[in-house]
Design a protein with these regions (language model features):
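Acidic-basic catalytic patches of nuclease active cores, encompassing PD-(D/E)XK
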Residues: 1-35
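Short amphipathic alpha-helical segments and helix-helix/interface helices
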Residues: 20, 79-80
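Conserved catalytic cores of phosphodiester-cleaving nucleases, focusing on short active-site segments
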Residues: 23, 41-62
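Non-catalytic C-terminal interaction segments of nucleic acid-processing enzymes
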Residues: 25, 95-146
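Short acidic/glycine-enriched loop/turn segments that link adjacent beta-strands
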Residues: 35-39, 96-98
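Short connector loops at helix/strand junctions that flank enzyme active sites
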Residues: 36-38, 49-53, 83-87
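Short beta-strand-loop-alpha-helix junction that forms the active-site gateway
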Residues: 55-77
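Short, surface-exposed beta-edge/turn micro-motifs
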Residues: 84-89, 96-98
């Protein structure tokens, strides 16, 4: 699947800033990953290091698990390359600033893997996703996230 640079340049800084603010309000010290092509951020809280990947989704607004319109949450397969490093995968809704999170060891299971042809928003071609039942995700309402 084609990487959409314009979307990345707009949404990556926003996602990192929102997630950083959220984590800092919860007592984490947050740092950018010095590896530009690695997992986005890491945080330290109570001497525990946690890794965070963040993505911003556009066009399908949600605020809670109940109004999330699908039974599963779709996670990009290209992030599987980091599966040996346990990390939290955070998706932020652009329209509402709600967020959802799931741990990588839950996401990247073969039973959730799905291939699909995509043709939208500058993306065209076959891509692989991991579709995780939303009950395995943590949903954070906008009032608690921003």
């Amino acid at each position: 699947m084609k990487f959409v640079k314009e979307s990345f340049e707009t949404n990556d800084p926003l996602g990192k800033a929102l997630l950083t603010d959220y984590l800092e309000r919860r007592g984490h010290d947050v740092y950018p990953n010095p590896d530009r092509y690695g997992i986005d951020l890491y945080s330290i809280k109570e001497d525990k290091k946690l890794w965070w990947e963040v993505e911003v989704k556009i066009g399908r607004p949600w605020t809670t698990m109940e109004d999330f319109q699908f039974p599963t949450v779709s996670f990009l397969s290209r992030k599987k390359k980091w599966e040996d490093t346990d990390f939290w995968y955070c998706i932020i809704c652009s329209e509402t600033r709600a967020a959802l999170m799931c741990f990588s060891s839950i996401i990247f299971q073969e039973e959730y893997r799905e291939e699909k042809y995509i043709n939208k928003g500058g993306r065209r071609g076959k891509d692989t996703f991991y579709r995780v039942p939303k009950k395995y995700c943590i949903f954070v309402q906008p009032k608690d996230f921003i």
